[in-house]
Structures are given as structure tokens and as C-alpha cells.
């Protein structure tokens, strides 16, 4: 009799604990919609093709508010593709406060996969990620808005003979994915800038890779009103000269109303893709002691770029190979297909950028857009309104 009573009480206690835990998890994750911006769809650029809505159709049970990595992972719910809105209300340390100890450890814990039909949006200026990467891989219909992502620091860079130390891990990755909108996102080296690198075996111990990679047949992507700052190898579109079978005809990306501030190169560098960049602001200095400006547009194998009404404020530009100093903005690797209309270089209207490539790029774009005439006041407005906390 006593044993039965004890067993009954134990079962009852266990059931109560399970119910309490379930209720606690539910109350932590489920939330009301804190901003109608979370239900907006991409309105211009390549991401409009087919429609990029993210989690706009999320049921009330799939709307979350998260403030730490445990809550964030629970809200993502693995590969669940039901529409979901994840509102980030605090600074999320992807490492969970536990330092990475090796390459394998960092790979296992720092790469956070984002499923299809998801909107991740920061609330106010609280939505931040450090010590990891947001990985959009093999999915479609994803929106990132109003977020700050600090570029991860590789704890175990690998050495390549003739090329020195190289790092893995980007702040964000779009890999074999379609219909992605990145809006009002800031990506920066933040608290660990490149001047903090040490040396190892007599060479610079590089611990940053890219800010954003778009690769492996990804398509229909728009990057808008975002800020990329304090970084070296910023945006790579198309990861390999030998990946044409997957990339050709894809990697179509629009950049508009973004700011690239004190970044060295790759804004972007493109292989195989078709890039449309309009009304962006580029700020840099060839003589910057930490992030010296090299170039903005990198034309890799079969890459094409249309530049319209952008603003370049770049100090100490130099003539390269006898060309106008402005031509350092466009670096030719294995492609020369490029056109520019109406951009300003150091405040002056110029058509000289068009002389920096051999073949003009005159695409027929399937979406509507309005490239505003670039002026100093427009450049200032774009600079003031780009990045997280400005939505």
C-alpha cells in the first residue's frame, strides 16, 4: 500500500514537472508580434522574383521572442519549414558563453542553420549575434532584418604554404538557397579588429574570413539598407572558378542603399553571378592603417556588374597600370563586363568608371526599381539610415 502510494506520488510529481517545464518553454518562446516590419516582404531587387516573404504567414504559435542561444535554437526548431517569425530581443552569444576549444568544436557549435520560410528580426537595437554564423543553406524564402552580426573569430586558423594563415567562418552564409532578403543588417569585426592579430611562425595570424558569402547556385537575393564596416574580405559571390555548372545563370543579387565603411575589398567580388548595385555608399582610405582600401567591385570568372548612382568617397586613390585613379574601384580578375551610370567619385559626377572595363553590361532587369540621382545629401541620408537599429 505504501509502495503504491509512493509510486503514485512519484508519478504525479513527475507529471507536474513535465507540465511545468512545458509551460515554461511555451511562455519563453511564444510571443506576440512586436513589430509589423516582421511581416513585410522584399519589395525590390532580385529577391522579389517568386516573392520573398519569410515567416509573414506564421501562425500565432510560430511567433517567438528570444534573447539567448538556447531560446533561439528552440525557435528555429531544426529543419521545421513552417513559416515562423523570430524576434531577437537581446544580444545572443552563439557560443553560449563557452569558448571554442578547437576547429571541430567551433564547427559543431558556431554554425546556426536557418530553415525555409523564416524571418529573423531584431527588436529596436537589441538584436545582436556574436561568436557564430547564421547559415542559410539548401533552403528558400528567408529574411534577416535589423540585426547586428559580429564577424566570428576563428580559434584554429589553417596554414597554407605560400598563402599564410587562413580563417574559416563568415558572419552569414547563403549557400544553395533562393529568395533571401537581408535588410538593415550590420556586419562588423566589432570588438576584434584586424589590428589585434598576432603573429605565428613569423606570419600574420589571420582569424577572420568573410562577412557574407553567397555561393553554390544561390539565387534571387537582395541586400538592402545594410552596413558592412571594419572588415577585409567582405562579400564573396561565387566561391570557385570551377563551379560554373552550378552557378551559371544564377547568383543574381541586388545591392541598394547599403553602406560599405572602412572595408578593404570585395563589395562584392563575383564569379558567374549578375550583380545590380544602385544607390550604395562606399567610404574608405587607401592609407587606412587597419583596413586599407583596395577595391570595391571585383570581376571574377564570368561575373557581371551594373553600377548605378552610387557614391564613392575614397581617399588617396592611385593610378594603376596607367588607368585613371577611379579605375581602382573596379578590379578585373577574369572578367571585364561592367557598366556604371551616374555614380559620384569623391563628390564629382563621372563617366570614367565605364572606361575601366572592356565590355559594357546592359542587362534587362525583371523588377521595378528607382535609382535616385546621387547627391551628397542622398549619400548622407543613406549613411544615416543603413544598418541595424534604423528600421
UniProtKB/Swiss-Prot annotation:
State if Isomerase is listed as a keyword: no
The active site lies at 266
Give the chief site where it resides.
Answer: secreted
Signal sequence annotation: 1-31
Q: Which residues form a coiled coil?
A: none
What does this protein need as cofactor?
A: Ca(2+)
SUPFAM superfamilies (UniProt xref): Pectin lyase-like
Keywords of the record, alphabetical order, are: Calcium, Lyase, Metal-binding, Secreted, Signal
PANTHER family on file: PECTATE LYASE 18-RELATED, PECTATE LYASE 21-RELATED
What's the family?
A: Belongs to the polysaccharide lyase 1 family. PLBC subfamily.
Descriptive protein name: Pectate lyase D
Q: According to the entry, what is the taxonomic lineage of the organism?
A: Bacteria, Pseudomonadati, Pseudomonadota, Gammaproteobacteria, Enterobacterales
